[in-house]
Curated annotation (Swiss-Prot):
Residue spans crossing the bilayer: none
The keyword 4Fe-4S appears for this protein: yes
UniProt-listed Enzyme Commission number(s): 1.17.7.3
Catalytic activity, as annotated: (2E)-4-hydroxy-3-methylbut-2-enyl diphosphate + oxidized [flavodoxin] + H2O + 2 H(+) = 2-C-methyl-D-erythritol 2,4-cyclic diphosphate + reduced [flavodoxin]
Coiled-coil intervals: none
Organism annotation: Psychromonas ingrahamii (strain DSM 17664 / CCUG 51855 / 37)
Cofactor binding, note field: Binds 1 [4Fe-4S] cluster.
Protein name: 4-hydroxy-3-methylbut-2-en-1-yl diphosphate synthase (flavodoxin)
Primary role: Converts 2C-methyl-D-erythritol 2,4-cyclodiphosphate (ME-2,4cPP) into 1-hydroxy-2-methyl-2-(E)-butenyl 4-diphosphate.
Enzyme class name: oxidoreductase
Binding site for [4Fe-4S] cluster: C270, C273, C305, E312
Length: 369
């Protein structure tokens, strides 16, 4: 059921990444980054399409060489989703991909070079109507900032960001977003909190190099959740040492948990105990996998007994409450005459969910690729 968020978002300027708005009152977008060799055009395009299929709003692609820039030209032509070029060290690569229709340029203040090079990138971005992300990272701060602070601190990250914000301001360029990422969640949170008080540009959130699928998801949920709950953030990436598709899933789960942006099914399930009347864990695991193609927001409660089951079902779009031999089924908080055989809960509940989606809108089902 609909539970609108009470979070008040920070007011930020809106920019466009391709046809996707970022900032202002636009939905908070979810993005990922390819981990294929960019020169392998087929593999990179295939991964971009997989990311698009699970809901990515935009995708970043690393462009480390001029050969990769030439490959990016083909990749862009074969992609429907906005693409961001990740540029480090060689500013001339940014100029090249701008010619090839890139939707956004990510530059790293720690290695992109002097102000003359930044001016060249900005002039090119302006000519091609391309926004820029100033992407500060705690692991690659400028040498003088590292020397000043000794180690990455919130103020160090923000100083790096503001130095480059000042350059863009002096160049009268305002089509940019900013990130101040760190691998330490608390450091990242403090950095974004500090930066949010000083600029009104859209903020790209992320805990960089967060870790593997489990630990990285937890670290990202804690850090990004803290910021999002304070209204900070306009777009996000969950950085995982895992399949990039998982980054999109976790990103939407974070937004869904805060009732900021819902996509797909929100399962409410008990941790189980000896009172369960059917196998809750197997049911949830099976349905999460089977129903990945559903994009329609929906709360589904799966509770193994009558202690909390009826109460959770009252607050869900669909719900099942464990009972002896057969379990009770609820829709829109109302108990239905249907009762589920406890040995066939998975198939029966999947059928009910798909029927509800079909009655609402077939566009809420995506094709798997």
């Amino acid at each position: 059921m609909s539970h609108p968020s009470s979070i008040v978002r920070r007011v930020s300027k809106q920019i466009m990444v391709g046809n996707v708005p970022v900032g202002g009152n636009a939905p908070i977008t979810v993005q990922s980054m390819t981990n294929t060799l960019t020169t392998d055009v087929a593999a990179t395009v295939a991964q971009i399409k997989r990311l698009e299929a699970v809901g990515a709003d935009m995708v970043r692609v690393s462009v480390p060489t001029m050969n990769a820039a030439e490959a990016f030209r083909e990749i862009k032509a074969l992609s429907n989703i906005p693409l961001i070029a990740d540029i480090h060290f060689d500013y001339r690569i940014a100029l090249k991909v701008a010619e090839y229709g890139v939707d956004c340029l990510r530059i790293n203040p720690g290695n992109i070079g002097n102000e003359r090079r930044i001016r060249s990138v900005v002039d090119c971005a302006r000519d091609h109507n391309i926004p820029i992300r100033i992407g500060v990272n705690g692991g690659s701060l400028e040498a003088d900032i590292q020397a000043k602070y000794g180690e990455p601190t919130a103020q160090a990250l923000v100083d790096s960001a503001l130095r480059h914000v000042d350059i863009l301001d002096r160049l009268n360029f305002d089509q940019f977003k900013v990130s101040v990422k760190a691998s330490d969640a608390q450091l990242a949170v403090e950095s974004y909190q500090l930066l949010a008080k000083q600029i009104n540009q859209p903020l790209h959130l992320g805990i960089t190099e967060a870790g593997g699928l489990r630990s990285g998801s937890v670290k990202s949920a804690v850090g990004l959740g803290m910021l999002l709950s304070q209204g900070i953030g306009d777009t996000l990436r969950v950085s995982l040492a895992a399949d990039p598709v998982e980054e999109i899933k976790v990103g939407f789960d974070i937004l869904k948990s805060l009732r900021i942006r819902s996509r797909g099914i929100n399962f409410i399930a008990c941790p189980t105990c000896s009172r369960q009347e059917f196998d809750v864990i197997a049911t949830v695991n099976a349905l999460e996998e089977r129903l990945e193609d559903i994009t329609m927001p929906m709360d589904v409660s799966i509770i193994g007994c009558v202690v909390n089951g009826p109460g959770e079902a009252l607050m869900s779009d669909l719900g099942i409450t464990g009972g002896s031999n057969k379990s009770g089924f609820y829709e829109d908080g109302v108990r239905q005459r249907d009762r589920f055989d406890n040995n066939n809960v998975i198939d029966q509940l999947e059928a009910k969910i798909r029927a509800r989606v079909s009655r609402t809108d077939q566009s809420n089902i995506i094709l798997k690729v």
